[in-house]
Amino acid sequence: MQIKKVVLLLLYLVYPQTKCLSQTLYGTNNYVEYQVGNLPIVISVPHGGDLIPTSIPTRICNNPETVTDSYTIETAEQIKAALFLATGCYPHIIICNLKRTKLDCNRNLVDGACDNSQAMTAWNEYHNFITMAQNTANSQYNNKILFVDLHGHGHTIQRIELGYLLSSSDLELSEATLNTTTYINQSSIKNLVLNNRNNYTHTQLLRGPNSFGTLLTNQGFPAVPSQQIPYPGATSGYFSGGYTTANHTCFDPAVTTNGFQMELNYDGVRNSNSNRMLFADKFKNVVLEYLNTHTNVVLGSCTPLAIDENNESQFIFYPNPINDVLNLSCSKDMNTLKVINIIGQELFNKEVNSNKVQIDLSNFSSGTYFIHVTTGKTIKTVRFIKR
């Protein structure tokens, strides 16, 4: 199993431009997972898991925080779906499936795993997956990627908190002070300050018109820091970023990636499926605009190709665009086929158990569709056009 994981990852690194599929790599006992993507977006979710294996004792070392960030995994999945519908491709997502009572991946190894060997293994696999994802994305997109450590907060004020490793009091400082080398070097977007296409200053990137917080607020989700809410205020709660942000962004001199910790409020964002879907759709707008504005990465049409070059399971479909009949072939038997429209409705679902299939789509309206092909535990997704 471990050899297969490594082979799959290496194949993905060799062919980053030719895949647009949702493939998941799992750590030991499925305690952590890496949903492989091909967008310049890496999202980690450390506190949404619910697994409570009896072989891992409840954490009691060093006064641990054990509260679950409810519905953060579900929110990440909605973000993934929204980005896929917009671009045809996926963000990289790393998830800890263990409940926080068993493991905290946003702490150092000692405090997070409390010296339990299974928890320590999961902690290491989680952070290795983040590094793998960032290396893959940075290689494909010339180090112009964004990392988001996704959390949920329980503070009274219902707004999104963006943590750039600057304290609440730091954010109250003047523009001139925040733009000094001292504070730039403390920031998790340090490299973006040094190299962004519009030469925006540190303060402008934190709370200017094109900052992430301002763009979120403009989409109907108040965020701090932003042009509208430049700093949290001394009497309100605020999370500035934790272990993951400090070790997987350019705050660490050995890392090139820009990023931040994103703490989502509960009401209106995480508390229902409809709210999570709405937020994911707006987040999609924001992250694509943010990358385009600051890094010149344009992702309006990330078109998947028709050939999966993974030697273990070669998949081809043709023609594209199609008139009536879609032909599919695979080096292994395909188990199920699904056709989904651009708004996520499933229009076709069939068990096939064959390596060659023809689908009659003559009754489909003209437009863009996605086909999901299941082969064993792998799901391949590609986009096609019906004339």
Question: Where are the regions that the model predicts?
Answer:
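Bacterial Sec-dependent N-terminal signal peptides
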Residues: 1-23
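Residues in and immediately flanking transmembrane alpha helices
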Residues: 17-18, 110, 333, 354
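N-terminal catalytic or cofactor-binding beta/alpha core of small enzyme domains
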Residues: 20-300
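Short, compositionally biased serine/threonine- and acidic-rich segments at solvent-exposed termini, linkers
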Residues: 302-304
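C-terminal outer-membrane/trafficking sorting elements
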Residues: 309-387
